[in-house]
């Protein structure tokens, strides 16, 4: 199983790249974890946000290919670490790749939401999209460590 994090936005601050890569490199070889960045549409005071969301959404879904789509969205389902570990095992047992989608400043397109088999909420708070990359990477690594009895996670 491969996990792909597909996120709108490029040129992240160095702390985001460093934080994400720290957890990415810890993943086992049999569960690769990759990041695909989708360039954000140009936004301005006269920007057609609906069109921008549609373009970003199409690019995200195209990057996902045949993987199971899971959106990261405030109205999604919150998972505890043990629940995320169970979810990780279920995805692994399904034998399919998983694509986690992080939208841009206005969120995800309706097409992305419609394509999603699941929606995961990290928090009822609105989080900065760059920070979400690091939180997701750490959360997935922690969940993996729980499934393998690795000492990283402690109750």
Swiss-Prot record:
InterPro entries per record: Alpha/beta_knot_MTases (IPR029028), RlmH-like (IPR003742), tRNA_m1G_MTases_N (IPR029026)
| Enzyme's top EC category | transferase
- A GO MF label: rRNA (pseudouridine-N3-)-methyltransferase activity
- The EC number of this protein is 2.1.1.177
Where is the protein situated, by its record's location annotation?
Cytoplasm
Q: Write out the transmembrane intervals.
A: none
Q: What are the cysteine partners in each disulfide bond?
A: none
Q: Name one Pfam family in it.
A: SPOUT_MTase
Reactions that this protein is recorded to catalyse: pseudouridine(1915) in 23S rRNA + S-adenosyl-L-methionine = N(3)-methylpseudouridine(1915) in 23S rRNA + S-adenosyl-L-homocysteine + H(+)
The UniProt entry's sequence similarity note says: Belongs to the RNA methyltransferase RlmH family.
For this protein, the record's PANTHER family field holds:
METHYLTRANSFERASE, RIBOSOMAL RNA LARGE SUBUNIT METHYLTRANSFERASE H
HAMAP family from the xrefs? 23SrRNA_methyltr_H
In Swiss-Prot or TrEMBL terms, this protein is called: Ribosomal RNA large subunit methyltransferase H
């Amino acid at each position: 199983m491969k996990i792909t994090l597909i996120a709108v936005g490029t040129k992240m601050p160095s702390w985001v790249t460093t934080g994400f890569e720290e957890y990415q490199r810890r993943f086992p070889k049999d569960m690769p974890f990759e990041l695909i960045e989708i360039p954000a549409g140009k936004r301005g005071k006269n920007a057609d946000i609906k069109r921008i969301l549609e373009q970003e959404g199409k690019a995200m879904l195209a990057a996902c290919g045949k993987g199971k789509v899971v959106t990261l969205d405030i109205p999604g389902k919150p998972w505890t670490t043990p629940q995320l570990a169970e979810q990780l095992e279920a995805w692994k047992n399904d034998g399919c790749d998983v694509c986690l989608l992080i939208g841009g400043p206005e969120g995800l397109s309706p097409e992305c939401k419609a394509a999603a088999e699941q929606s995961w909420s990290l928090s009822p708070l609105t989080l900065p999209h760059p920070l979400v990359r690091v939180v997701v990477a750490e959360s997935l690594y922690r969940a993996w460590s729980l499934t393998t009895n690795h000492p990283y996670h402690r109750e």
